[in-house]
């Protein structure tokens, strides 16, 4: 359970980073 929770947190963190990168890229090109 603990490992799955950690995996979920890492997955969510990657999604957040990705979103921020995407938003930065869109801001740079938009």
Swiss-Prot record:
The EC number of this protein is 1.3.1.31
Q: Does the keyword Iron apply?
A: yes
GO function terms (MF aspect): 2-enoate reductase activity; iron-sulfur cluster binding; metal ion binding
| Substrates-to-products reaction catalysed | butanoate + NAD(+) = (2E)-2-butenoate + NADH + H(+)
* Top-level EC class: oxidoreductase
Q: Superkingdom, according to UniProt?
A: Bacteria
Q: Which cofactor does it need?
A: iron-sulfur cluster; FAD; FMN
Keywords per UniProt: Flavoprotein, Iron, Iron-sulfur, Metal-binding, NAD, Oxidoreductase
**Role according to the record:** Involved in fermentation of amino acids (Stickland reaction) such as leucine, isoleucine, valine and phenylalanine.
**Assembly behavior:** Dodecamer; tetramer of trimers.
Question: What name has this protein been given in UniProt?
Answer: 2-enoate reductase
């Amino acid at each position: 359970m603990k490992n799955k929770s950690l995996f979920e947190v890492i997955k969510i963190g990657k999604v957040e980073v990705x979103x921020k990168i995407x938003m930065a890229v869109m801001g740079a090109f938009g």
